């Protein structure tokens, strides 16, 4: 019985560690006005997906009344940072 309990505990712990270390990551994007994009829970998932597209990420949704973008790196959180980092126009960004 003790072996069974230890085995179950080990499986649960390894599963919890695996789930926490393999998260997709993401960020709340920041607008031109240096504020987060607000939304209504689950009603604005399409809006948030469009916002995330502006930040170079293909998927996002409304979470805790703000848009959340999956796999949005810290480098591209701000609207203009994404364009500076990815735009090839030397006249705008020397």
Curated annotation (Swiss-Prot):
Disulfide bonds: 39-62, 48-67, 52-69
SUPFAM superfamilies cross-referenced by the UniProt entry: Scorpion toxin-like
Entry's Gene Ontology molecular function annotations: sodium channel inhibitor activity; toxin activity
InterPro entries named among the record's database cross-references: LCN-type_CS_alpha_beta_dom, Scorpion_toxin-like_sf, Scorpion_toxinL/defensin
Gene3D superfamilies: Knottin, scorpion toxin-like (3.30.30.10)
Cellular localization per UniProt: Secreted
Name this polypeptide is given: Neurotoxin 213
Originating species: Lychas mucronatus
Lineage: Eukaryota, Metazoa, Ecdysozoa, Arthropoda, Chelicerata
